[in-house]
Regions:
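Feature for soluble, non-membrane regions of globular proteins
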Residues: 1-152
Length: 152
């Protein structure tokens, strides 16, 4: 994880800073939404930075993670969208299994824009569900993401 954080993520940060140098600051959600249209430097490095920053925030030590339970609202969405927490976990694990996503990328559990349904999606490379055009169902908001690149 140290190499992943100190090398891979640090490179994305340096490269997105270079790609956006001299430009007005924009909120990260706006940057992600327009990343595909902005070109490969913003798409790949902005996505890489966002995805990894998100990934670090969702991590917890195993003993803490084992005690964590979904809120009532989240549990209701899980039940509506997947049937149960165990079924959501099983589908997530299957989608993240080696070979399930062609090439390298990320697997995400997202909430749709209406806030009433969860979806399991995969994105190639450093794309994410906040990018316009990255997933079939339009822009969605990630609540869980997993790096499934070969180095991860």
């Amino acid at each position: 994880m140290k190499i992943h954080h100190d090398k891979h993520h640090a490179t994305y940060v340096a490269n997105i800073n270079k790609a956006t140098e001299g430009k007005d600051e924009v909120p990260v959600l706006d940057l992600m939404e327009s990343a595909i249209e902005a070109g490969p430097a913003v798409r790949n490095n902005g996505g890489g930075h966002y995805n990894h920053a998100f990934f670090w925030q969702e991590m917890a030590p195993p003993d803490q993670a084992a005690k964590t339970k979904p809120s009532e609202q989240l549990q209701a969405l899980i039940d509506k969208s997947f049937g149960s927490l165990d079924e959501m976990k099983a589908q997530f694990e299957a989608r993240a299994a080696p070979g399930a996503l062609f090439g390298s990328g990320w697997v995400w559990i997202c909430v749709n824009q209406a806030g009433d349904e969860l979806k399991l999606v995969g994105t190639p490379n450093q794309d994410n569900p906040l990018m316009k055009g990255a997933v079939e169902d339009g822009i969605m908001f990630p609540i869980l993401g997993l790096d499934v690149w070969e180095h991860a």
